[in-house]
Amino acid sequence: GVVDSAIDAETR
């Protein structure tokens, strides 16, 4: 989802 995508970019 949108939130999941944002978190993924931050935790990369």
From Swiss-Prot:
Location within or outside the cell: Secreted
Cofactor needs: heme b; Ca(2+)
Name of the top EC class for this enzyme: oxidoreductase
Molecular function (Gene Ontology), one example: metal ion binding
Keywords recorded for this protein, A-Z: Calcium, Heme, Hydrogen peroxide, Iron, Metal-binding, Oxidoreductase, Peroxidase, Secreted
EC number of this enzyme: 1.11.1.7
Cofactor remark from the record: Binds 1 heme b (iron(II)-protoporphyrin IX) group per subunit.
GO biological process: hydrogen peroxide catabolic process
UniProt KW Heme keyword: yes
Reactions performed catalytically: 2 a phenolic donor + H2O2 = 2 a phenolic radical donor + 2 H2O
Record-level GO cellular component terms: extracellular region
Function comment: Removal of H(2)O(2), oxidation of toxic reductants, biosynthesis and degradation of lignin, suberization, auxin catabolism, response to environmental stresses such as wounding, pathogen attack and oxidative stress. These functions might be dependent on each isozyme/isoform in each plant tissue. Suggested to catalyze the deposition of the aromatic residues of suberin on the cell wall and thus play a role in cell-suberization.
Similarity field: Belongs to the peroxidase family. Classical plant (class III) peroxidase subfamily.
Protein name, as recorded: Suberization-associated anionic peroxidase 2
